[in-house]
Amino acid sequence: LERVLPVIGCYADTIVETGPLGSAHTIKLLNNFLALATGAVVGEALAAAMSLGVDLSVFDAAVRTGGADSAMYRRFAHWALEGDDSHFQATMRIGEKDLRYYRQMADAAELPTAMADAATQLYRLASQLGHARQFMPVLPSILASLADGRERALPRRE
């Protein structure tokens, strides 16, 4: 590991020794699941706030002072508040793929996947509605439009 650290450091922001061969992949899948499931919850909450007419800046102030604040919330909030989806440049299609890999690992170990299944449904729905290439932070706008019928502008990425 010591010999390759300088090379890995050229393209990795964080390097964590995870243990035996294969453990890094397992941890990556777990981390991606946690981030994507959180993103799905954040997306649904922001969509509800949009559809209910909540002042998003007030909602944001409340979230940032409580336990719901997270890196994923902040990445999605940039879109909801400023129309900037660049803070998490992963597409709905990538979300589906990463959750599928997590579910395969969990299924093989006979672990529950209820949250992974629910998150997968939201990213798959966005993809099926024609937004597979959209970055994940626009999920709230897609879900809000579906719920209330009001069209919301999305980045031109299709």
Language-model features and meaning:
Residues L1-L36:
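Rossmann-fold dinucleotide-binding core
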Residues S23-L146:
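Helical "substrate-binding/catalytic lid" subdomain
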Residues S141-E158:
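Terminal low-complexity tails and localization/encapsulation signals of metabolic enzymes
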